[in-house]
Regions:
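An N-cap/entry alpha-helix motif that binds or orients negatively charged groups
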Residues: 2-64
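Structural preference for beta-strand elements that scaffold enzyme active sites
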Residues: 48-52, 83-85, 113-117, 137-140, ...
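Active-site mouth loops of central-metabolism enzymes
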Residues: 50-70, 114-123, 143, 226-233, ...
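N-terminal active-site wall of soluble small-molecule enzyme domains
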Residues: 60-159, 163-166, 172-177, 213-217, ...
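Glycine-rich phosphate-binding active-site loops on the catalytic face of alpha/beta enzymes
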Residues: 82, 86, 130-150, 189-205, ...
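Catalytic cores of alpha/beta
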Residues: 123-135, 172-185, 222-223, 228-251, ...
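Active-site/ligand-binding-proximal alpha/beta "capping" segment
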Residues: 183-271, 438-447, 453-472, 476-479, ...
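C-terminal helical cap(s) of enzyme catalytic domains, especially alpha/beta-barrels
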Residues: 210, 215, 219, 242, ...
Length: 548
């Protein structure tokens, strides 16, 4: 079953803009200054936030429809903005070239060291000249809407005028255009600089993914000036962007709605430093992007609640991407350090075996699942992280530390929420807004524990589908995994009880000794069920790829 086709909002914006251009020219009916009235200001020389003068957007409608562009920009400067962006698109964002002129003049008078970016859907060199005349110090060039040759020629024009360039990318093809542009204009840049902006928002659908910017980290030159664009509304999300190592953060709605409160966002971004949590998310983002390029759609598979070393070996052999171990005294699947030492020995053996056969060994990610951060079991899991026996922690149904918290700098982590009602949906959405790039959702069970085999209400799932990349747990089995994949396209699926052994029925004549023999070890997996699970997953992925 194919997912509904999303509207291509970008195409609509470009069509409307072209119609206005055809009617009024690239001045869009505004008076353009005959000459530039100020020198070009260097764009974002240090790590900082770019705050945006923004009245509306296609996704949110009116944001601050009555804002005064010049006054808002001056407030941004007082709040610590490293640069100021001015949206000049008229139909959907309700900006104008008059805003650009007014902001440039006002900010230069009060804060001459702050550069102004013209943000629009520029398509011709003439628009670069107009931007320069109106006082812009930098221009946005969106690789997605420009052919490579046009991108390069517009970049040359900008640099010839001393303007810096914010080249925005999001798709694989965009990255190639960016690299070609950089090679083409390498000589003669002068003081102007090229920045790489990566948008969390897909301009075609306006859906957000906060990990997309980080997914390109390993494919750009070291030292590239990278800007995290869109989607940040809270100080926690600002900290996440700073934590991930970006040079700049472009913020629109959050700043425009409360210009006088923007300093908290700016400070959080600037103060956040990379840590082990950021390294984990960057690695995951890059791996996920590489996986999509190579395989197309292929969800990550996590097998959770393992207690038997043979099951761990089966997971490795079948290709599980993640293996989960429970560190909660309330769980029958709780494990401790000695078992993780066995796992370490097994992984070393498997790596040696693969090397002897000249095969590639892909090590699964080892996750510790905790339900109470203050419990002895959780403290044991944190120690195992520091000792290299676990890779990350799943905070299951308990508060997860926000990004860039110094106390948690050495603990890679993600949140898992129990979903059973509207309040749980709001909790999930709140975590996303507060800088958690992925949140696992599990069914809320009557026992309060995970791994019960209960399913999430599909009404609730439908409410969050499309809000983020889904990480799903709760009642997933070989019998239903194909339907789940075809309906929801999860990025990760988490299976526990769905592949566990079940005790056979006892005959009436069974005595106590026989009863003992038929007891099943807590968390013990059924190899045949796991084999069937992976086969069903592959079948579903094949169907998704055919639909694509």
């Amino acid at each position: 079953m194919a997912l509904p086709q999303q509207p291509d909002i970008l195409s609509v914006i470009l069509e409307k803009r072209k119609a206005l251009h055809d009617q009024k020219g690239f001045s869009f009916g505004h008076s353009i200054p005959l000459k530039r009235e100020k020198p070009v200001v260097p764009f974002l020389p240090e790590k900082g936030a770019i705050l945006e003068v923004k009245r509306a957007s296609p996704s949110r409608g009116d944001i601050a429809p009555f804002l005064n562009a010049a006054e808002t920009a001056c407030t941004y400067a007082e709040q610590g903005a490293g640069a100021i962006s001015v949206l000049t698109e008229e139909t959907f964002f309700k900006g104008s070239l008059e805003d650009l002129c007014a902001v440039s003049e006002a900010v230069y008078k009060k804060n001459p060291g702050i550069a102004i970016l013209r943000k629009d859907f520029l398509v011709e060199e003439e628009e670069i000249d107009i931007s320069y005349s109106c006082g812009a110090d930098a221009v946005l060039l969106i690789a997605r809407i420009l052919e490579t040759e046009k991108l390069c020629s517009m970049a040359k024009k900008a640099l010839s005028l001393g303007l810096s360039i914010l080249c925005e990318i999001r798709e694989e093809e965009d990255l190639g255009k960016y690299h070609t542009m950089c090679r083409t204009v390498q000589k003669g840049r002068g003081q102007a600089r090229i920045f790489l902006g990566i948008n969390t928002r897909d301009l075609a659908t306006f859906v957000l993914d906060p990990l997309v910017p980080s997914s390109f980290f390993y494919d750009v030159e070291e030292g590239s000036l990278m800007i995290y664009e869109s989607g940040v509304k809270t100080v926690e999300a600002a900290a996440f962007a700073g934590n991930m190592g970006f040079h700049g953060l472009l913020m629109g709605e959050a700043a425009a709605k409360n210009p006088g409160g923007a300093s908290a966002l700016v400070t959080k971004f600037k103060d956040a430093k990379p840590d082990m949590n950021a390294v984990m998310w960057t690695s995951f983002a890059a791996a996920m992007r590489s996986r999509r390029k190579t395989l197309g759609y292929a969800p990550y598979v996590k097998i959770c609640g393992l207690t038997d070393i043979d099951d761990v070996e089966d997971c490795i052999g079948l290709g599980a991407d993640m293996i989960g171990f429970i560190f909660s005294a309330k769980s029958k699947r709780c494990v401790h350090r000695p078992f993780l030492l066995e796992v370490k020995e097994l992984l070393a053996k498997e790596k040696r075996r693969a090397g002897a056969h000249k095969e590639k060994f892909i090590r699964p990610v080892l996750t510790g699942v905790i339900t109470d951060p203050e419990s002895p079991e959780a403290q044991e899991a944190f120690t195992l992280i520091r000792d290299g026996l676990l890779d990350k922690i799943q905070f299951h149904g308990c508060p997860v530390p926000p990004p860039a918290e110094k106390k948690w700098k050495d603990i890679p982590r993600y949140a898992a929420v129990k979903m059973g009602n509207d309040e749980d949906v709001e909790c999930f959405l709140d975590l996303l807004e507060r800088g958690q790039p992925r949140v696992l959702i599990d069914a809320r069970s009557s026992s309060g524990e995970g791994g019960t085999g209960e399913r999430i209400d599909e009404v609730l799932l439908d409410r969050i589908k499309g809000k983020t990349q889904l990480w799903l747990a709760g009642g997933i089995t070989p019998a239903n995994v194909e339907d789940i994949i075809l309906k929801y396209r999860p990025e990760l699926i988490d299976i526990a009880s769905g592949v566990e052994e079940t005790a056979p029925p006892l005959d009436e004549e069974d005595d106590d000794d026989e009863l003992g023999k038929k007891d099943i070890k807590a968390g013990k997996k059924d190899r045949l069920k796991m084999v069937e699970l992976f086969e069903k997953i592959e079948d579903a992925c094949d169907k998704v790829r055919l639909e694509a």
